[in-house]
Amino acid sequence: MSLVEIIEGKARILIPNYKDYMKDGKFDPSWAPVFYNPKMILNRDLSVLAANVVKPKSLIDGLSATGVRGIRYGLEINGVEEIILNDIDSDAVELIKKNVKINDLESRAKIYNNNINSLLHEIKVDYVDIDPFGSPAPFLLSSFSAAKSKQYVAITATDLAALMCSSKTSARRKYGLICNKMSFSRELGLRGLISKAITEAAVVEKAVTPVFSFYNDYYYRVIFKVERGAKKVDRQLSKLVYYYECPKCGYRIESEYLQQMKCTNCNLVMQTYGPAYKESLVDYEFLNNMISELDKFSYFQTFSKLKSILLTIKDESKYSENYYRIDFLASLARVNVPRRDNVINCLVDASRTHLDPLGVKTSKNLDEIKECIKKLSSRNTS
């Protein structure tokens, strides 16, 4: 395996030479013997920023591949005393060893060639990071088991086809979801992922609360705070609901029960999604701490984009309702789609959402949003 060196964050990382694995002039990271995805740099930048808020003394990068994520934690977060890097693939482990050495982390790094679930059941750390190719569902129970009380677990999910209902059978198998596409499916997918995490953690009597959640390109990223106690677990389980939306008029409702719900306006059977987490997707204090710390990381390759995402999330987190998609409501009203910023100005109390370029978050009700869309559309055509 020939290698090339790249720089990411403060780390020097050896990765497989992509030119050796190209097919018909194209390259996919999964074709290389050890996986490295440059499209996930923003994910890793954000993860370093969030972990800097947590300041763990011990952590595990459970599915390490090249080791880039765990190595960056060791180099870019003050106070990390122990970094556990693990991969089940022996080629990956050999590459991790090389990368740990060239970054002078041998005294703090422990490298394993284990099944990640087995390893997680043997350790206790302050911060667990699971970044799989696909679903994190098989690793949730062991991840929460490995996290110390009042510490953190961070997960990535790239199987959005399941979480956003393109594959209803996968949604049921992997996440226990009753899954129908709705106008705000990107938010529901995130809430469905959090719901699965809460129910898995409950098995080991741990209550998990999302302190930061976001969507980018083709994945979700969620950071959970983990606490012990049956009563806390029960409180989190009580925050799981089913969402219903009318495909004809856009009317929405939530219920703690799974049932066939009919729209009170149209008498049509409503689309169903759940169980899904109904509370805030971020902890406001944690988010503000991330924003406050960001300037320390101006060297991030994705600094500008990351700052924009965080500020948008700060704005939208003021609103408890799920986002509304402008083109969906415009199509129901049979009018042209107005610009999002114009809709926000019309509503006054509203913001963009990072989840969807056509989405708005607002305190206003459905009828008020529709009225703004109609009014703006009539101006454009007059």
Swiss-Prot record:
Protein's job: Dimethylates a single guanine residue at position 26 of a number of tRNAs using S-adenosyl-L-methionine as donor of the methyl groups.
Residue numbers binding Zn(2+): C246, C249, C263, C266
Binding site for S-adenosyl-L-methionine: R44, R69, D87
One MF term in the entry's GO annotations: tRNA (guanine(26)-N2)-dimethyltransferase activity
GO terms under biological process: tRNA N2-guanine methylation
Protein name (database record): tRNA (guanine(26)-N(2))-dimethyltransferase
Domain Trm1 methyltransferase: 4-373
Chain segments annotated as transmembrane: none
Family per record: Belongs to the class I-like SAM-binding methyltransferase superfamily. Trm1 family.
Alphabetical UniProt keywords: Metal-binding, Methyltransferase, RNA-binding, S-adenosyl-L-methionine, Transferase, tRNA processing, tRNA-binding, Zinc
